Amino acid sequence: MSVTRINQQTECPSSVHDLVSCWGGCTQSKTSTDSGLEKRFELNFAQPVDIGTVTVKQLASVMERAGESLRQNSAELGIHTLKFDRSLLVFTAKQIVVRSSVSVMLHEAVHPMLELMRSHNIIVDWASFMRVNYGSPWDMTSETSDIMAHEYAELKSAFPTGHPYLAGPVDRDHCFYFVYDGIDRDPSSCRRENDVQINVYMYNVQADDEYDLDGNTKEQQLLVSHCAGEYETLRVSTYGSTHPFASFETNAVSAASDITKIVNGLLKKFYPERVLLVLLQDRDAQGTTACGVMDRLEGFTVVHRGANHFGGGYVFHQATYARSA
């Protein structure tokens, strides 16, 4: 398949002109200043894979295309973890998830990652790319609109049938979310979709000496393995933001059943000014326990809340909160 490399061009492909015009054009950014907190890229596999078939060197080579250098890697309970300067990559039998600072041009790793999967005969049947912004993409003090235009063009080139979404108020905390869905949902396949993904983004956090927020260390990355393929990750960072922030993610079933306690524990520990909560819930996920956390954030009031119901039966919940007076 012919691939258009927009990161080597000053113009976007004609197929995406209508949408990128909303962002003010598609010129090359010069300083990569960005009014965002984090980017997230996920690939889901049609069949479970042997994570040992893809080497650390190969994954690190892909991330080098986005300007990242490998610092540390480990393997535990069926989860391979790669820590880079500003990114955290988690590889399981079902998926690859990369979370990074907005200063990383993560979209430049999209095509290389797909090419790596194809070289191992790994079929990707679902993918997403999410960025969390704390201000308007058209803010004149940043180049967010240009960077987002290139992200969208690269994603649309890689996944022509994928679609972009915006969740939340565009002039303050919101998410840009691109989704490709190629899952075969033929009833005869008897495939169950029961994943739950929970993300908590905390703005302008405070913490004790456990995290060196004011020192030379710009990024702290932690991962806890629950069981095969289930994990919790935490990034505490000052990259790409004037204030330190923390972001938490889990796909663990045990965490989903007790997520209210976990989230309130994070808020007590980091004492953020604002919080953005994201929940992606598959159609076969048992119960709605995880959604209940959105009503019970101690010490915070809702600024905005919404949900996007996808045709595949899964739901993207998003809510923003401000600390109560």
Curated annotation (Swiss-Prot):
Gene Ontology biological process terms in this record? positive regulation of catalytic activity; positive regulation of spermidine biosynthetic process; S-adenosylmethionine metabolic process; spermidine biosynthetic process; spermine biosynthetic process; trypanothione biosynthetic process
Q: Which Gene Ontology terms of cellular component type are present?
A: catalytic complex; cytosol
Q: Which Pfam families match?
A: SAM_decarbox (PF01536)
Name the SUPFAM superfamilies on file.
Answer: S-adenosylmethionine decarboxylase
Q: What is the reported phenotype of gene knockout?
A: RNAi-mediated knockdown at the bloodstream life cycle stage causes cell growth arrest followed by death. Putrescine levels are increased and the production of spermidine, glutathione, glutathionyl-spermidine and trypanothione is severely reduced. In addition, protein expression levels of ornithine carboxylase (ODC) are increased.
- What InterPro entries does this protein's entry cite? AdoMetDC-like, S-AdoMet_deCO2ase_core
Q: In which pathway does it act?
A: Amine and polyamine biosynthesis; S-adenosylmethioninamine biosynthesis; S-adenosylmethioninamine from S-adenosyl-L-methionine: step 1/1
Q: Which UniProt keywords apply?
A: Polyamine biosynthesis, Spermidine biosynthesis
Mention one GO molecular function.
Answer: protein heterodimerization activity
Sequence similarity: Belongs to the eukaryotic AdoMetDC family.
How it assembles, according to the record, is: Forms a heterodimer with S-adenosylmethionine decarboxylase AdoMetDC; heterodimerization is required to activate AdoMetDC.
Q: What does this protein do?
A: Probably has no catalytic activity due to the loss of several residues required for processing and catalysis. Forms a complex with S-adenosylmethionine decarboxylase AdoMetDC which is essential to activate AdoMetDC. Required for the biosynthesis of the polyamine spermidine. Required for growth and survival during the bloodstream life cycle stage.
What protein name applies here?
Answer: Inactive S-adenosylmethionine decarboxylase prozyme
Provide the species name: Trypanosoma brucei brucei
